[in-house]
């Protein structure tokens, strides 16, 4: 094992995560229908600051992410600062790393803390699959630019006459890789076939996720980390995730048809995460700054790692690549972990990564390591359910996982937790957290 890389400031302070919060997650076109991501971000950051009772001017930086970008608000982070009563001089910028976006936001704030340029910051992300940047065809886009430069009505009419009826149809954003054209579900199907993952195994994992999430809500474990929201017309509160199927049975999952490979596939809507709306954020500080403000941290950021692989085949293997690197940088092994939380983009992707984490062959031949990262103990894995149940507002999922894992570590008396995710573009992210 290589030498650990401690995440500390120049003064030796650890990176403390003092609090975290999220909105409830809503299935596309339900409770948050019509609410843009920037407004979801304002909701969660405003409430996070109010609950923490931290002076607004104590926050020196806000790094926020959004995957489905809206042209009218390209820097969501700055709009959140301006819309929540924070000090207008607060530094704010936006990041995007697909499904690992809020992991990146946390890493960026942590790096600012370690560099000594700030002592406290907020990191998070928000996405709306209900408010989308609906575009136009390339042909229409070109004509519109030319029309804007045309000087006469005749020139404008001539330009429009070149268009066909199909050129006028709206173009929704593609949920596919730009470089390959493959949808995420196509990659999940690849992985199911490559690693011999059956439909029954996928359905069982999805069912487990929903059962664990429903139990977490029933036992009140999520109440402290999920805010109650009110949206126009402000008549009814929205306080709990609305995707969780607590009363479902395995037989219900078996009824669904494959969603991507219609003839020979095993990936369905039920064993995949749904399109979702929501936001999540965390407050990070140096350990000494938290003490000055009289705050008891939820926990500490021990290490993080980002990786990238090719996108043509089985590209959602980010956790299998980033997990050993994050553990190595933390000076830990899989056996040292109290909790292991993996983003469930698809059941097939999750099961493939779990399989490879325990594979000596993958470790030696692909990663160039002497031994496998280690089998993940089922008693430590996604103990409160995962993204298949909660949903996946792309940029918010990492902050949800971090907050959820730290609260659960505290309930268990402390320890180490690892959170990890795959992301579009063949990217992977992992973070090791510590609670006392």
Curated annotation (Swiss-Prot):
Its EC number is 2.3.1.16. Pathway: Lipid metabolism; fatty acid beta-oxidation. GO terms for cellular component: cytosol. It is an enzyme of class 2 (transferase). Keywords: Acyltransferase, Cytoplasm, Fatty acid metabolism, Lipid degradation, Lipid metabolism, Transferase. GO terms for molecular function: acetyl-CoA C-acyltransferase activity. GO terms for biological process: fatty acid beta-oxidation. Its main location: cytoplasm. The active site is at residues 99, 392, 422. It comes from the Bacteria. CDD domains: thiolase. It is found in: Cytoplasm. It catalyses: an acyl-CoA + acetyl-CoA = a 3-oxoacyl-CoA + CoA. Belongs to the thiolase-like superfamily. Thiolase family. Catalyzes the final step of fatty acid oxidation in which acetyl-CoA is released and the CoA ester of a fatty acid two carbons shorter is formed. Heterotetramer of two alpha chains (FadJ) and two beta chains (FadI). This is 3-ketoacyl-CoA thiolase. It comes from Salmonella heidelberg (strain SL476).
């Amino acid at each position: 094992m290589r030498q650990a890389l401690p995440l500390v400031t120049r003064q030796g302070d650890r990176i403390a995560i003092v609090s975290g919060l999220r909105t409830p997650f809503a299935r596309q076109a339900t409770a948050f229908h019509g609410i843009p991501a920037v407004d979801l971000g304002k909701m969660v950051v405003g409430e996070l600051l109010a609950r923490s009772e931290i002076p607004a001017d104590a926050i020196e930086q806000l790094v926020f992410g959004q995957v489905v970008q809206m042209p009218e608000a390209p820097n969501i982070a700055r709009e959140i600062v301006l819309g929540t009563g924070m000090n207008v001089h607060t530094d704010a910028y936006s990041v995007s790393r697909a499904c690992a976006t809020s992991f990146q936001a946390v890493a960026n704030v942590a790096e600012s803390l370690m560099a000594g340029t700030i002592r406290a910051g907020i990191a998070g992300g928000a996405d709306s699959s209900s408010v989308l940047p609906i575009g136009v065809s390339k042909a229409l886009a070109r004509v519109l630019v030319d029309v804007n430069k045309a000087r006469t009505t005749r020139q404008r009419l001539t330009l429009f006459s070149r268009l066909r009826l199909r050129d006028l149809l709206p173009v929704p954003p593609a949920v596919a890789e730009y470089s390959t054209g493959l949808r995420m579900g196509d990659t999940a199907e690849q992985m199911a076939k490559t690693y011999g993952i059956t439909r029954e195994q996928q359905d069982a994992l999805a069912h487990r996720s929903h059962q664990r999430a429903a139990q977490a809500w029933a036992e009140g474990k999520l109440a402290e980390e999920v805010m109650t929201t009110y949206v126009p017309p402000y008549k009814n509160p929205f306080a709990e995730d609305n995707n969780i199927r607590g009363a479902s049975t395995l037989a219900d999952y078996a009824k669904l048809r494959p969603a991507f490979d219609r003839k020979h596939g095993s990936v369905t809507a039920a064993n995949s995460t749904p399109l979702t709306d929501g936001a999540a954020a965390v407050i990070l500080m140096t350990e000494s700054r938290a003490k000055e403000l009289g705050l008891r941290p939820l926990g500490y950021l021990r290490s993080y790692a980002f990786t990238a692989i090719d996108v043509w085949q089985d590209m959602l293997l980010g956790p299998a690549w980033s997990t050993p690197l994050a553990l190595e940088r933390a000076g830990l092994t899989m056996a040292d972990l109290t909790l292991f939380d993996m983003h469930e983009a698809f059941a097939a992707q999750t099961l493939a990564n779990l399989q490879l984490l325990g594979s000596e062959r993958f470790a030696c031949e692909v990663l160039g390591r002497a031994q496998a990262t280690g089998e993940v103990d089922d008693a430590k894995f996604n103990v409160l359910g995962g993204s298949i149940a909660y949903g996946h507002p792309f940029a918010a999922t990492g902050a949800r996982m971090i907050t959820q894992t730290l609260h659960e570590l505290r309930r268990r008396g402390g320890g180490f937790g690892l959170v990890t995710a795959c992301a579009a573009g063949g990217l992977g992210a992992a973070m090791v957290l510590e609670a006392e």
